[in-house]
Amino acid sequence: MQPLFKRCGAEFFGTFWLVLGGCGSAVLAAGVPQVGIGYAGVALAFGLTVLTMAYAVGHISGGHFNPAVTVGLAASGRFGWRDVPPYIVAQVVGAIVAAATLASIAQGVAGFDLVASKFAANGYGDHSPGKYSMQAALICEIVLSAGFVFVILGATDKRAPAGFAPIPIGLALTLIHLISIPVTNTSVNPARSTGPALFVGGWALEQLWLFWLAPIAGALVGALAYRLVGTPSAQR
């Protein structure tokens, strides 16, 4: 196992890449006239960030890039609880630095208003892309976060085909975005939500609690579900 500072460094860079690539595609490329990538392009971008960084640094840190994933892996017994806080700090800092980088790029075009653009922040109610309620957002984020952690645990199981885990994980994140961008702008990742929210302020910070609570709760559900169905009977 790599030293903790190296693993946290890998988590920093992985989360930085996720937020810069995923949120960057939403802020810079989704609505470009005629050639904008739209929801499908943004969903694919998020999946690609995880797939590429999982191959790049997964062997160093495990490739979490997400506080909810870290908590879910710890709850499943795959990761030590004592390393959860430093991993989460590294992930959140990586997300904030990525959001700052993205803001500096986005503001390089005349007329860009960071707050008015919503800067890929997550929200519900009036701040949901489809105006979905808080209850709908809560259910969506819990269920999809549970599914994401379930896929991660299955794909990284020792009984699963070796070397392919980043592919189903990246595809799962793409699918999650295809489902939930209209609902919450898709979080399933508290660090990803925190970076943009700090720059938007106001409503984004007021609603940030949901995008910590729901993904972590969902991760715990996903971990429990995989323990129930994925653990060999002799080990229960």
Swiss-Prot record:
Site (Involved in tetramerization or stability of the tetramer) residue list: 23
Keyword terms, alphabetized: Cell inner membrane, Cell membrane, Membrane, Repeat, Transmembrane, Transmembrane helix, Transport
Motif NPA 1 mapped to chain: 66-68
Superkingdom of origin organism: Bacteria
Main location: membrane
SUPFAM superfamilies noted in UniProt: Aquaporin-like (SSF81338)
Annotated catalysed reactions: H2O(in) = H2O(out)
GO MF, one annotated term: water channel activity
Membrane topology term: Multi-pass membrane protein
UniProt xrefs under InterPro entries: Aquaporin-like, Aquaporin_transptr, Aquaporin_Z, MIP, MIP_CS
Sites annotated Selectivity filter: 46, 177, 186, 192
Record keyword Membrane present: yes
Transmembrane segments: 12-32, 37-57, 92-112, 136-156, 163-183, 197-217
Motif (NPA 2): 189-191
Locations listed in the record: Cell inner membrane
Gene Ontology CC entries for this record: plasma membrane
Chain's role: Channel that permits osmotically driven movement of water in both directions. It is involved in the osmoregulation and in the maintenance of cell turgor during volume expansion in rapidly growing cells. It mediates rapid entry or exit of water in response to abrupt changes in osmolarity.
Assembly notes: Homotetramer.
Family the UniProt entry places it in: Belongs to the MIP/aquaporin (TC 1.A.8) family.
Domain comment in the entry: Aquaporins contain two tandem repeats each containing three membrane-spanning domains and a pore-forming loop with the signature motif Asn-Pro-Ala (NPA).
UniProt name for this protein: Aquaporin Z
Organism lineage: Bacteria, Pseudomonadati, Pseudomonadota, Betaproteobacteria, Burkholderiales
Gene field: aqpZ
